[in-house]
Amino acid sequence: MNKIPHEERAKVYAMALDKFGAGTQMVVAIEEMSEVQKEICKAIRGDVNLQHLAEEVADATIMLEQIRLMFGINGEVCAVMDAKVERLRQKIEQS
């Protein structure tokens, strides 16, 4: 399978938002995150299926990227992620 460039993904996300609407895509995002939660719970119980987990994480990530596009918050999300990773690094180093 060929890797899809970020710019092409963004075009597809925009097309999905235009076709299905922001409200529908927000609901789908919630559903996909719930499916990740379900797979993590299964893993905790010792019933991990890595393929299912990977698929659900991919689905949720796609939907979260649409949310970033929908609200125009990509730059903000990147900045907050950098700050949170730095805070995590400091916490690890201090413990």
Where are these regions (language model features)?
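Flexible "arm" and connector segments at domain edges
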Residues: 1-95
